[in-house]
C-alpha cells in the first residue's frame, strides 16, 4: 500500500491514476485484517470494548486525514502529498510488524476453543449472519448518503460560496467526531448488556436523529444533529463485529469478518449513489426521510432476528 500510494505521486495521466487507485483498493486490506485480528485475539468478554477502541482509531483517521490532505498540497504540492501518505503507511507497516504480537497456533483444537452453546445455535442460522452483514452495510449507507448533496443542502441553508467548502467539511467531520467520543463506551456497553440490545437501540436512535436533519434552518443545527448521529451510530459496527465473532466457529471467524468489511464497503458505495439519486429526482429533504426510514426498518428487522432466531439465554451476547 505504501508503494502504490507513492506511485500515485508519479502518475502520468488519468489512466495511471485510475489503475493505481484500483490497485490501492485491492491491496488495502489493513482495516479488514486489523478487525479480524482484534476480533479473534481479544477476550470474548472484552471484544466489544476492543473493537470500539479500534473503531475510534479508524474514525480519528477519517477525521484527521481529509484535514491534513487539504493542508499539505499548499506546502509540498499535490504529488508530494501522495509521497507523504506513502511514508505514513510505511511507518504504520513497520510499527505493526515490530510492535503487534499475534497469539496464533494452528494446532489448537478450535472446537474446544469456541464451540459453545452460543456458537452451535447461531452457526445453524445463516439468516443471522446475513442480517448482521446487511445491518453493517446500512450503517455506512446512512453515514455516506448525504455526501453528494451536502454542499447543495448547505447552500440552501444560507451559507455563502466562499465558506461552503469549510462548512461542509465541518458538518461531515461532526459525525466522525461524535463517533470518536462514544465508540469505546458503546462497545463496552455491548459487553455488559449484550450486543443485540445495543444494535437495536443504536439503530433506533440513529434513525430518529436522521429525520430532524431534514428540518434544519441553519448549518450549525445540521452539524449538531450529525454529531449526535455519530454518537449513536458508533455502537453499531463494534457490536456487529462482536456478534459475528461469537456467531461463527473460530475457524470461520476471519473469513466472516472479511465479509463484514465487504458489506461496509458496499454501504460506502451504495450510500452516495442512493443519496444522489433521491436528491436529484425527489428532493434533498427526502434523502434524510428515506435514510432514516431505512434505519428504523433495520432496527425492527434486527429485533425480529433477535427474538425469532436467538434463544433467551444467548441474547446477552
Give, region by region, the residue ranges found by the protein language model.
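Juxtamembrane intracellular "pre-TM" segments in multi-pass secondary transporters
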Residues: 101-132, 316-317
Amino acid at each position: 500500500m505504501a508503494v502504490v500510494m507513492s506511485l500515485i505521486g508519479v502518475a502520468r495521466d488519468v489512466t495511471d491514476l485510475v489503475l493505481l487507485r484500483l490497485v490501492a483498493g485491492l491491496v488495502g486490506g489493513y482495516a479488514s485484517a486489523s478487525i479480524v485480528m482484534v476480533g479473534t485475539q481479544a477476550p470474548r468478554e472484552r471484544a466489544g470494548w476492543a473493537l470500539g477502541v479500534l473503531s475510534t482509531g479508524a474514525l480519528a483517521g477519517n477525521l484527521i486525514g481529509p484535514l491534513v490532505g487539504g493542508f499539505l498540497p499548499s506546502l509540498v504540492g499535490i504529488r508530494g502529498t501522495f509521497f507523504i501518505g506513502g511514508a505514513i503507511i510505511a511507518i504504520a507497516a513497520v510499527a505493526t510488524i515490530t510492535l503487534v504480537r499475534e497469539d496464533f497456533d494452528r494446532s489448537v483444537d478450535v472446537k474446544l476453543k469456541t464451540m459453545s452453546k452460543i456458537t452451535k445455535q447461531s452457526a445453524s442460522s445463516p439468516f443471522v449472519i446475513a442480517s448482521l452483514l446487511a445491518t453493517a452495510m446500512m450503517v455506512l449507507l446512512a453515514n455516506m448518503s448525504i455526501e453528494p448533496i451536502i454542499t447543495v443542502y448547505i447552500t440552501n441553508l444560507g451559507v455563502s460560496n466562499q465558506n461552503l467548502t469549510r462548512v461542509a467539511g465541518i458538518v461531515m467531520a461532526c459525525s466522525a467526531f461524535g463517533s470518536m467520543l462514544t465508540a469505546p463506551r458503546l462497545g463496552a456497553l455491548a459487553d455488559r448488556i449484550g450486543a443485540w440490545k445495543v444494535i437495536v437501540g443504536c439503530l433506533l436512535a440513529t434513525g430518529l436523529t436522521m429525520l430532524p436533519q431534514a428540518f434544519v434552518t441553519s448549518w450549525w443545527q445540521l452539524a449538531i444533529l450529525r454529531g449526535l448521529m455519530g454518537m449513536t451510530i458508533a455502537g453499531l459496527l463494534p457490536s456487529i463485529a462482536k456478534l459475528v465473532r461469537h456467531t461463527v466457529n473460530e475457524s470461520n471467524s476471519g473469513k466472516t469478518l472479511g465479509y463484514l468489511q465487504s458489506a461496509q464497503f458496499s454501504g460506502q458505495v451504495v450510500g452516495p449513489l442512493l443519496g444522489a439519486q433521491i436528491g436529484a429526482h425527489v428532493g434533498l429533504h427526502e434523502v434524510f426521510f428515506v435514510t432514516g426510514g431505512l434505519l428504523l426498518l433495520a432496527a425492527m428487522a434486527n429485533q425480529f432476528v433477535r427474538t425469532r432466531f436467538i434463544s433467551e439465554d444467548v441474547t446477552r451476547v
